[in-house]
Amino acid sequence: MKKLAVLLAFLVTNGSQVSAFDTADLKKFKDTNYCRKCDLSNADLVNGYLKGADLNGANLNSANLKGANLKGANLKHTKLHFAFLWYADLEGATLQGANLKGAKLDFAFLWYADLEEAYLRNADLEGAYLEGVNLKGAYLGFANLNGATLQYADLESANLNSANLNNANLNSANLKGANLKGAVLCNTIMPDGLVIDRGC
């Protein structure tokens, strides 16, 4: 009986940690496209038209934004842990200091987006389009960038420790001061246009 009580307490506690979005915040956002520092965790925003949205400092942990249009959106300092952003359009979006740990950004469009000092540990960016993106000082440790396009990307002082850069295109990218320790560079196009095979 005691064990059952402990188990129930555990489930209740963990259930509260996976709490859903605030319904009032979601309504406000849908009505105004503005929701700074609000709670939209676990919200279903699949294919949403959110162009130019202001979500500065919002909680979007585990939110489903697959295919969403977030062009030019303000996502500074947002929490996007394990958020689903497959095929999302984030062209020109601002994600400075955003926490994208474990986020799913497969084949997302991030042309000229600003991710300066963003946290992308274990993020999945397979096949993502990152031309001209600002990743200065960003943390990309253990991130999956297999097949990602990073032409003209600014990765100055970025941390790519143990990142997967297989088949990635870094042609004309800025890697000044970047940490590539342990990164997998197999069939990877480097800034000078040469193809490198390291860790294959």
Give the label of every model feature segment.
Residues F21-C200:
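Tandem repeat scaffolds
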Residues L4-T13:
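Sec-dependent N-terminal signal peptides
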Residues S16-A20:
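Sec/Tat signal peptide C-region and signal peptidase I cleavage site
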